[in-house]
Regions:
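Bacterial N-terminal signal peptides
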Residues: 6-16
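Extracytoplasmic c-type cytochrome modules immediately beyond a signal peptide or single-pass transmembrane anchor
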Residues: 19-21, 33-34, 74, 83, ...
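Sequence context surrounding c-type heme c attachment/ligation sites in exported
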Residues: 20-76, 80-101, 330, 579, ...
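Secretory-pathway/luminal and periplasmic proteins that interact with or process carbohydrate-rich
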Residues: 55, 87-88, 112, 343-347, ...
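Short coil/turn segments at secondary-structure boundaries
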Residues: 89-93, 116-123, 277-279, 346-351, ...
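Substrate/cofactor-recognition hotspot
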Residues: 186-188, 196, 206-208, 212-215, ...
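Long, ordered, helix-rich scaffold segments
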Residues: 241, 271-323, 384-410, 414-417, ...
Length: 853
């Protein structure tokens, strides 16, 4: 482009993109390609991407307005310009007042063009949240930009799978009240935990089973359980955004079927899933009448206690009554509706479901009719979605409307809880005291301060943020796993990972109880919550010299044990010979019987000693592994109902510390390390991407479909060496931001064990922070601990944490209009000494949470 033409374009950009009036982010850009986007491309892009230059084999010279044929290219332009990858850093950069309208124009055009072709929602994707420039959010607002008052869009928000199954669990199981003497034990209001196999299931009557036939697998197949219905992709990061989840027809059909099971259990308890003779406090009575043969794995293999443990509700009263009355039916409909929607029905809704149930009773009789009618309520919109439409408020001049009454009350409840509002919050809603910011502040402060009020949504934030709960779902190669130093066969490893998730949950809760410098503590704590089997996972692989010394010590111990056993064997032989003589001489039967018992004991001892002489002492322990010492106060972690017989998960845990210099914080715990690994090895790229996105606030564009994103298969080569292919010029632009941040974690293997050598050579855990956005952070790091320490002390890292908290509690990506909300939340977090409670209160009382547009 000529200098003269560039001058003309600059003038056009100044008039067009600079706007006659201040630019308001998010407002529709009502300009056409020729007069606007084309000029931006001419000035900022064509110098490198015209037909003559064509850098990266890409020409934009003939690119026209957005249409379905070039939508992919425009999406790529949007990503590159958003991340400031283009124009390159050495080139003149567009001002914010030029770049932001250009990006808004692309988004608007892609939404318009792709409306009937699957739509365009990339800008709403939680993984694209960092595409918004961090410095714009926390720095001074550039000239020419004016912010609109914050508000979230009107929406209906599907409940999460965890929230849905916890709602249903409330109908059929009575969870214990909070016990301050046993914090950590599963309590009413806690989320339903996954079971021993990582499945999220609803169990019927598990708390009443007192006997079963068979072992662990037989129990698991005998007990009545139903899996979670609502779909959710089990992947890294936040996923609970309203834009990305709905309820399909298959799910609706399943919900209806499960609703019938639930209604019947509410009415009849185990009688709905078992025969009357199975319900007894004396299992021997069932043994006399049970079906003959092998019942393992069948529902008839179970025996239930007669003690009623489920909630006895109006549904029970309705079905128990010999005569159907309108009052009983009314109470049952009211109860079920509020139980699954968290609010009382309107007169119209009540009339509708009474009619449905009454007609069903007329057609098929009372029992089946009640089940059919009440099951329909489980498919009510508000049983599956939470509406935030601002139906009660009055819109202001700027188009915003504040949530009020039930909409606001349920939004506040959802911010912390999975079960319906407690009595105080419900009464506030009914009394009209959930209409102002002060009302919200009052209720949120109360609930946050009350330990007995369970807050599973807070814990879920940390699961989604850290992604430490995925380790049990990564299918490991048995041989590769065995080489790490942990059991490589059977389900032991996967059970250990699901236990590790529960343990990490508990550690986070302990840090939240202290509520001081929460993020820094999570990143740097030396504390761990562990089971007794975690000594291997928190252990360290020995050096070659240490292994040789351990093997030599084992051999020496075996030799000494054999020598001692040989001497003991001779002694036992002499004793047995003498005893044989006594037995022969014994005349009365009682004496002989006593001597025979003594001989049997000596022969058992002789056999044990002979085994030691033959095979050695069988010294316990892996000579290649130094196991961690698990000692400290006994505590509890939250686990599922009995799901695997006697092999079910146990809540008992130990609060201990890790060896200094080996680990630091959650990012060095096996739960996080394995969650960021693959079947065969570590996943340094995934770990580095996590650091880049979750702590540094950087963004990574999507991998082009033409890229074969595979490392070479070289089993006897270190991961660092195999990752050399990512240093190719085409790859390194993105991998430079990830690889050097993930490779410091090579001081651990893919089962999470600490190591100093790999394939017989010293491990290289060095790395480097580049282009972090904070010059004080950039530079080399020695290993993962050095990296974590630097990051934990960074102001930028805390601000990025605030951004992620915003996304989670608002259910959307932040926009530039949310800048003041984010800045205020950060100041509150800092002034409170890093309090999570203060941060949540700030976010939940912000305009972005309270208002809809």
């Amino acid at each position: 482009m000529s200098v003269i033409l560039r001058g003309v374009v600059v003038g056009a950009l100044g008039a067009g993109i600079g706007w006659a009036n201040p630019y308001i982010p998010g407002e529709p850009v009502k300009l056409v390609f020729k007069d606007f986007a084309s000029e931006f491309l001419d000035y900022h892009c064509l110098e490198c991407h015209d037909e003559a230059t064509k850098k990266g084999d890409l020409s934009l010279e003939d690119l026209g307005p957005v249409d379905e044929t070039n939508a992919a290219l425009w999406k790529s332009i949007w990503a590159q310009v958003s991340l400031k990858e283009m124009p390159p850093k050495k080139k003149e950069q567009p001002k914010a007042v030029e770049r932001l309208p250009f990006l808004d124009w692309i988004v608007g055009e892609l939404k318009r063009v792709m409306k009937d072709k699957g739509g365009f929602q990339a800008h709403l994707d939680p993984q694209k949240g960092n595409f918004l420039d961090h410095d714009l959010l926390f720095g001074e607002l550039p000239d020419g930009i004016e912010l609109a008052k914050p508000a979230s869009p009107k929406r209906i928000w599907r409940v999460t799978p965890q929230e849905h199954i916890t709602r249903l669990n409330e109908l059929i199981n009575t969870e214990p009240k909070y016990d301050p003497e046993k914090p950590g034990v599963r309590t009413r209001g806690d989320t339903v935990p996954t079971n021993h196999g990582g499945e999220l299931k609803l169990y019927f009557g598990a708390d009443r089973i007192i006997k079963w036939q068979g072992g662990t697998v037989a129990y698991a197949t005998s007990v009545k359980s139903v899996p979670v219905v609502l779909s959710s992709t089990r992947k890294h990061g936040f996923e609970n955004y309203p834009n990305f989840h709905t309820v399909n027809s298959a799910e609706a059909t399943q919900i209806l079927g499960k609703a019938e099971d639930i209604i019947r259990y509410m009415a009849y308890g185990p009688l709905s899933i078992a025969n009357p003779e199975q319900i007894t406090d004396d299992p021997a009575t069932y043994e006399k009448v049970r079906p003959k043969g092998d019942l393992r794995g069948l529902p008839t293999a179970l025996v239930y206690s007669t003690k009623v443990k489920r909630p006895l509700t109006p549904v029970y009263e309705l079905m128990k009554a010999s005569k159907l009355t309108e009052e009983l039916l009314l109470k049952a409909v009211n109860y079920v509706f509020e139980a699954v929607t968290f609010r009382p029905p309107t007169d119209k809704e009540l009339e509708q479901y009474l009619l449905v149930t009454s007609e069903a009773i007329e057609r098929v009789g009372k029992e089946d009719g009640v089940v059919i009618g009440l099951s329909a309520i489980f498919l009510d919109r508000d049983a599956l979605f939470r509406s935030e439409l601002g139906v009660s408020g009055k819109p202001s001049k700027d188009g915003r409307v504040m949530l009020q009454d039930w909409e606001l009350g349920l939004a506040v409840n959802h911010a912390l809880s999975y079960i319906k509002p407690d009595e105080q919050l419900r009464q506030s809603i009914v009394d009209g005291r959930m209409r102002t910011r002060v009302d919200v502040k009052r209720e949120v402060t109360r609930m946050l301060a009350d330990e007995s009020f369970r807050k599973p949504r807070v814990l879920r934030f940390f699961r989604d943020y850290f992604d430490y709960d995925l380790g049990g779902y990564i299918c490991k190669d048995d041989k590769a796993l065995a080489a790490t130093g942990v059991p490589g066969r059977g389900s032991n490893h996967y059970r250990a990972m699901f236990d590790a998730t529960a343990s990490t949950d508990r550690l986070i809760e302990l840090i939240l109880e202290e509520d001081k410098e929460v993020l820094k503590e999570l990143l740097t704590t030396q504390k761990v919550v562990a089971t007794r089997n975690d000594s291997k996972y928190f252990g360290r692989l020995k050096t070659k010299e240490e292994r040789n010394a351990a093997i030599a010590a084992q051999k020496k111990a075996d030799k000494l044990a054999k020598e001692k056993a040989a001497a003991e064997l001779e002694n036992l032989k002499e004793k047995l010979a003498a005893l044989d003589a006594k037995i022969k001489a014994a005349k009365d039967g009682q004496t002989k019987k006593s001597l025979d018992r003594e001989k049997k004991q000596l022969e058992g001892a002789k056999k044990r000693v002979q085994n030691i002489v033959k095979r050695g002492a069988g010294t316990k322990g892996d000579p290649a592994l130094k196991e961690a010492e698990i000692s400290g106060p006994k505590i509890f972690a939250r686990v599922s109902h009995r799901s695997f017989g006697n092999g079910s998960m146990k809540p008992e845990r130990t609060l201990t510390t890790v060896p200094e210099g080996e680990r630091m914080g959650i990012l060095t715990h096996p739960s996080w390390l394995v969650s960021h690994s693959d079947a065969m090895d570590n996943h340094a790229i995934l770990r580095g991407r996590w650091i880049r996105e979750r702590l540094l606030g950087g963004g990574i564009p999507d991998i082009p479909i033409t890229v074969d994103a595979m490392l070479p298969d070289q089993p006897n080569t270190t991961l660092r060496s195999r990752m050399r292919v990512t240093r190719d010029t085409y790859c390194w632009t993105c991998h430079e931001k990830m690889d050097p941040l993930g490779l410091p974690f090579e001081m651990f293997n893919h089962a999470g064990l600490h190591r100093t050598t790999e394939l017989g050579k010293p491990v290289d855990p060095s790395g480097v922070i580049v282009d972090s956005g904070d010059p004080k952070l950039d530079g080399p790091v020695e290993n993962a601990l050095d990296l974590i320490k630097k990051l934990s002390e960074s102001e930028r890292v805390e601000q990025v944490f605030i951004r992620h908290a915003f996304r989670y509690w608002m259910g959307r990506n932040e926009t530039l209009n949310d800048a003041l909300v984010l800045q205020e939340a950060y100041q509150v977090y800092r002034k409170s000494g890093g309090s999570m409670q203060a941060l949540i209160a700030s976010l939940v009382t912000s305009d972005a949470f309270l208002y809809r547009r």
